[in-house]
Amino acid sequence: MNQNIAKAILPLAALSCAQGKMLAQDVARPNILYIMCDDHAMQAISAYGSPISKLAPTPNIDRLAQRGMLFRNCFVENSLSTPSRACLMTGLYSHQNGQRQLAEGIDTTKTFVPELMQKAGYETGIVGKWHMMCKPKGFDYYHILDGQGKYYNPNFCTTGNYGKYKQEMGYATSLTTKHAIEFLDNRQKDKPFCLYVHHKAPHRNWFAEPKHIGIYDGVDFPLPKTFWDNYENRGSAAKTQKMNIEKDMELILDFKIPELLDTSDVESMSSYSGLMGELGRMTPAQRMAWDKYYMPRNRRFIEAKLSGKELAVWKYQNYIRDYMSVIASVDESVGQLLDYLKAHDLDKNTVVIYTSDQGFYMGEHGWFDKRFMYEESFHTPLIISYPGHIKEGVENTDMVQNIDFAPTFLAFAGVEQPKEMTGKPLQPLLAGEKPKNWRKDLYYHYYDYPTYHLVRKHDGVRTDRYKLIYFYGKGGMRAVEENKYQNIAGTSENNCLRYLYATNYFNEDPDVSYYELYDLQNDPDELNNIYGKKGTEKVTKQLMKRLNDYRKELKIDEY
């Protein structure tokens, strides 16, 4: 066994056995239950203590934090759904595994972590959102949603029938939980398991389960202090994005107001079609629950004729109310899975990991969505519990990243980490230790432009105090020539591009090539770009060197 991995595992599991003996004793190889939500912000988990979550608590996720370790500084390497999932599966950065963007790209010749877990004797399964354009590799069992999936009565395909989707009646979060429990019920009891539970929730457009619709009606969530940000002191990327709650959230689709349909407007028609795509799947009982809340709310909104800041605040409040109503089902799911483990005497030998594919804006800077290297979307929640091996109720502030997840899985399984994986197993941190060579900085790279939200391509490096970001690339439709799959007819990337162009989505964005520098100690909200300011020469030089070192070491190929 690789000595570094052995040192990480043995103190944690209190073992003194060689690799062969460890592989023969399943007690040394815990079960792994990995729960990942889509777009679940740290701000929406009460264990992290944000003002939003105090009004909409998550008691079951908090319960997990109380019995394990909560990470305050977990980050992603590319804040976008599919690239994040590809990183999880391969342990590689986006440019290494091919998945730079949302649709095409994943290099299926790369070894997937579940394949290595299988070889180590684990029974592997995944339920819920897969969202990669390839067949699940390395899984004994899968029961996955069709692409992004729908909240109501979604389509799933299962093991042996990849691509053959069938509709199932119910709510996506509840159905995903049901299939997770089915896997646990039917697994081979003489083998350890590794189960990925990937929820669609709380992805946009935030359709709550019938029993949770409107549960936060009347709750006034506090506005983030940066909600009215005007993006001064920053470059053009913060100004040309399309993820502003006030300007870019759609009244028909995001706020579920079909009464506002304008049949003469292509954007209105598109938004209405998206809403009907969800409402049209509902059963009469589901639609009745939806109508009971939204119809009177919509009437009140239309009669109020809000505009300006009043409209922006209304949008914010109802965005957060719907989002947190969706989270209520996620929290219940976590509770059900924890209860199952305890009831079946699996809780003591199961590592439970809770995270999200990336962070999300909950009104900070006036935004929703993710993509930027700014803190709210760069951060992601991470909570890990392993009773008897990880101290209860502890917090960790070391810098970790989602490229560390794959090595951590392998270390728990006693599998040597492939050399191509550059992440670090988290076992030393989980054991309360911090290796002297633990990272002092992180690399980030976002590629997906031009597409939804128009966030510009950028990469950067972050230390515990400073962050340097480089924005680059051609603007608007000129950027398509730099985008591999958008140039290939028939690809999902090309189809998306054509749709957005037809609906007049794109701006005439400028070509960009500029840096931003932030002092996170004195400016945690990243409102003041100090790049080029007097007194920053030394730290800028240090960060520039580190950024260029990363580009060279990782063989970044977009320059």
Where would I find each of the regions flagged by the language model?
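Positively charged n-region of N-terminal signal peptides that target proteins for export
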Residues: M1-K7
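Residues forming the ATP-binding cleft of Hanks-type serine/threonine protein kinase domains
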Residues: Q521
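Formylglycine-dependent sulfatase
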Residues: N2, A13, C17-L497, T503-E516, ...
